[in-house]
Each structure stands twice: as C-alpha cells, then as structure tokens.
Regions:
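Extracytosolic ligand-binding ectodomains
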Residues: 1-169
C-alpha cells in the first residue's frame, strides 16, 4: 500500500486510538503519510460525513482502530456511498457481528489477529463441546478458556483461591 491514499480512523478509545496511533507512527516512519486521520465516537451510527471526507480525499485504504460495531457500520456506509476502499483493522473486528453489520461489503477486509486456535488438533474436543451447546467459539473464546484452565490448575495445585498464591504458583 506504499503509494495508496490511506485513511487512519479510530473510535477515540484507548484500544482504538492506541492502535490507530501506532499504525500511523509505523506508516510515517516508513515514509507513508495518511491523507485522513480522524476519530469518531463510539455509539455513532451515521458516518456519511466521514465517508464523504474519505471519498473527497480519494482514499483507497481505510485503517480502522476500533471495534466491530462501528467498523461494520463504516464499511457498510462506505459501500452504500460507492467508496470501495480496502478496509483494514486489528482484532477488534474479530466477530461474526462485523460481517452481519457490514454486509457483503466486508468481503476483502484485511485484519490482524493471532493464529486461530480452533484449527489446532488439541482444541478439537473443546471446540466440539462449545458447539454442542450452540456456542461458536470465535475470536478470543479459546484463549480465554485456556487462561481459565491455567488459573484452575494453579488453584487446584495450591489448594487455594487466594489470588496471590494462585499467581505465585
């Protein structure tokens, strides 16, 4: 994307703005300057003014620092207004709801996320157990499950629920 016109948009939260700021910093260090840098409010629903600004700037790539709800709305409204810029984001959009909200326009979205643990052979039994309860273990579900298992093992080993003892184990 070195020669692309890139917008960096964020949701003004510590996560979203932090992600956007670090992405902007990394781009700028490589000589890539964003054409739009802007924050939006979480809970906002109408991004038509933002999309108009992106279109006027000729944006080809939108980097989104934020979560799936606003990200989905932004990509839907971009497509509705004829802006076919590539959407790129971090793990905050790692949810089936992003696609539900964003619609078919999310096709081709690029995102960063650690490897999907659902495909690992040692996760097969846990994935099957979640699915048997009609739960799709998406995004961080299995990482969270593994963290709880580690805490449980430490509590069992120390025969204590004292957080300090569990943490020291």
């Amino acid at each position: 994307f070195k020669d692309a016109k890139i917008a960096v948009i964020h949701d003004k939260t510590p996560y979203g703005q932090g992600l956007a700021d670090e992405t902007k910093k990394a781009m700028n260090a490589k000589g890539i300057k964003e054409v739009v840098y802007e924050g939006v409010n979480t809970g906002e629903k109408d991004f038509s003014a933002l999309v108009s600004k992106l279109k006027a700037a000729g944006v080809e790539v939108v980097y989104w620092g934020g979560l799936h709800t606003e990200g989905g709305l932004i990509v839907r409204q971009m497509r509705d207004q004829g802006l076919n810029a590539v959407m790129m984001s971090g793990d905050g959009i790692t949810s089936a709801e992003f696609a539900t909200i964003g619609g078919p326009g999310v096709e081709g979205t690029l995102m960063t996320f650690p490897p999907d643990p659902r495909g690992r052979p040692e996760a097969a039994k846990v994935v099957a157990a979640f699915k048997a309860k009609k739960i799709d273990p998406e995004s961080y579900t299995l990482y969270s499950y593994a963290a709880v298992e580690v805490i449980k093992q430490a509590a069992d080993a120390t025969k204590s629920l004292d957080p300090k003892k569990v943490a020291e184990h």
